[in-house]
UniProtKB/Swiss-Prot annotation:
Record's keyword terms, sorted: Chloroplast, DNA-directed RNA polymerase, Magnesium, Metal-binding, Nucleotidyltransferase, Plastid, Transcription, Transferase, Zinc
Transmembrane intervals: none
GO biological process, alphabetically ordered: DNA-templated transcription
Compartment(s) of residence: Plastid, Chloroplast
A Pfam family reported for this protein in Swiss-Prot or TrEMBL: RNA_pol_Rpb1_1
UniProt-listed SMART domains: RPOLA_N
Source organism of the structure: Adiantum capillus-veneris (Maidenhair fern)
Annotated protein name in UniProt: DNA-directed RNA polymerase subunit beta'
Principal location: plastid
Alphabetized InterPro entries for the sequence: DNA-dir_RpoC_beta_prime (IPR045867), RNA_pol_asu (IPR000722), RNA_pol_N (IPR006592), RNA_pol_Rpb1_1 (IPR007080), RNA_pol_Rpb1_3 (IPR007066), RNA_pol_Rpb1_3_sf (IPR042102), RNA_pol_Rpb1_clamp_domain (IPR044893), RNApol_RpoC1 (IPR034678)
SUPFAM superfamilies: beta and beta-prime subunits of DNA dependent RNA-polymerase
UniProt lineage: Eukaryota, Viridiplantae, Streptophyta, Embryophyta, Tracheophyta
Subunit structure: In plastids the minimal PEP RNA polymerase catalytic core is composed of four subunits: alpha, beta, beta', and beta''. When a (nuclear-encoded) sigma factor is associated with the core the holoenzyme is formed, which can initiate transcription.
Gene from which this protein is expressed: rpoC1
Amino acid sequence: MIHRTNYQQLRIGLASPEQIRSWAERELPNGDVIGQVDQPYTLHYKTHKPERDGLFCERIFGPTKSGVCACGNCRSVNDEGESSRFCKHCGVEFTDSRVRRYRMGYIKLACPVTHVWFLKRIPSYIANLLAKPLKELESLVYCDLFLARPVAERPALLRLRGLFNYEDRAWRNILPTFFSTQNYEMLRKNEIVTGGDAIREGLASLDLQSFLNCAYLEWQASVKQKPVGIEWEDRTIRRRKDLLIRRIKLAKDFLRTNMKPEWMVLYFIPVLPPELRPIVELHEGELITSDLNELYRKIIYRNNTLREFLSGSEFTPEGLIVCQKRLVQEAVDALIGSGIRGQPMRDIHNRPYKSFSEVIEGKEGRFRENLLGKRVDYSGRSVIVVGPSLSLHQCGLPREMAIELFQAFVIRNLIGRHLACNLRAAKCMIRKGNPIIWEVLREVMRGHPVLLNRAPTLHRLGIQAFQPLLIEGRAIRLHPLVRGGFNADFDGDQMAVHVPLSVEAQIEARLLMFSHLNLLSPATGDPVSVPSQDMLLGLYALTIESRQGIYRNRHLGFIDRVNVYSTKLLHFSSYCDLLRAKESRQVDSHSLLWLRWKIDLQIISSKIRELSSESHYESSGTSFHFYENCRIRKCRDGSISSMYVLTTAGRILFNQQLKEAMQGVSKNSFSYTTSSTLSTSTIDRCNTNSNNEE
């Protein structure tokens, strides 16, 4: 059994035939070696007890009842002594029945078969290593083609090379007349091969280091090769480069992990523990079983038939043996990955079997459903909605969820402040909703961050830390700018809330995981907290002029750009005057106005350096220069004495909010702008300026 205290990580890789066998094989005190499943039976049709050496054998997988053997004898599980722990008649161990959840068996195949994951998946690892087309390899695996293999340092009688079709050869019916059956079989085994044997020999003959060196040299030569200008030739060169890169990566992985390519061909099939593929008895006495049991039975039936054919090969036609090898390969394919690039195997009711791949893959598979998707304490889940009034590092938690998540902390606080005498009294106060509870909860939440996670967690920004705030309702509220990191939308998406318990977890959340510290993508460095959708529309509506867009048709008395200087517009000397006028409803967000601008600030517009459209000079030497968006008053010496910009109240409010939100950035980065959106380039510039200041 795997104990979580002994193992800190899990690595998935290829297993050698000896390792697969060692998973299940063990020796009894009487010297018998058990573990091999060689009978296709499951339960006896009358007694419903496991059959010996079958798929539910108690000798191999353990007793169905704790301390009870197949004979019905009972003995304590804690009895000491090797001989007393086994029944001498049936060989069943007197142990806990829970061992049937992790004890495995194995099926010894009469012929090697190719693992369908490494053959038919895209990209095909076997095809990449052998540098052969996938269709040819599939024909070889399923015994449609044969491969010539002359014995080393011996002359080849048939003079065959490469792949060929056995049925098309004329000598197939001539040679048996000149050789005895035994000699002809020996000749055939030395000269030709098909099925998993051919794939295993090809993979075993690879020298990975020399293979890697040759592939690397060829890739270097192809990189130096220039395009010839012909489309199909250039495409062929690119495909060859991609193939070489895949082969180099694959060879490096095999060398790094000390795994052998021939392990992709199976000699032993591991049999899952019975509790993971159960047979359930219904009330009427009927039995329902897992599809894996039926697939295992097919493999054992076909494998036993092939073993009988091979044991009497002198009298068995060659075509029958080849056909049976193909059936064994198809049965193993159906068990591991039914329907990969083909039709799945079906039962008598035309229902496709559920293979091992379908059991472990997908959202409802073994990994995501049972291992990664476990329910954990101090967590909750709810729908997310937008919270525009929140700060970037804040989230709104419903009161009902927050009191459940922080109940232990609230109880400790109540008892520590002598507001409750014991645990029962504190829980009673929480259940009744005493008003003091919410004050204590706010105090607890003030110093405790929470983690928000949206599945699937594809990158680091899929889980971030926030400062929780109590809100009404039953939905979690988020600042609209943080949705980019989660790849979430406010259209019904759900997010999980986790409470970090240890001090180390809380420190990590505050220093590394807070949302305002994760504004850039860790993969590309691009900003992820950028306005989109309704935020862009709101910024557009805030910064639009009364003579533009939808307001052009709504307000008939709009001002033309030509007579803007001849029209009487409101003048304001500061932002505070404008704010007071806005609060008293003297101006709206879209009305044009003149605002006195500080001379030491720069306008983010190059038009101030252009020629003025009109200039007025006074006898005192002062001059007025009129531009498209501003007017400047200069002294006699040419210095600027005052400057007014043409803008709207909405733009000024947006610009001021932008400056206050980015106080740590250089003031030059946030001068007045007429842009209606906070673009990604603005955030890039702000980030660059802040880095320069640091």
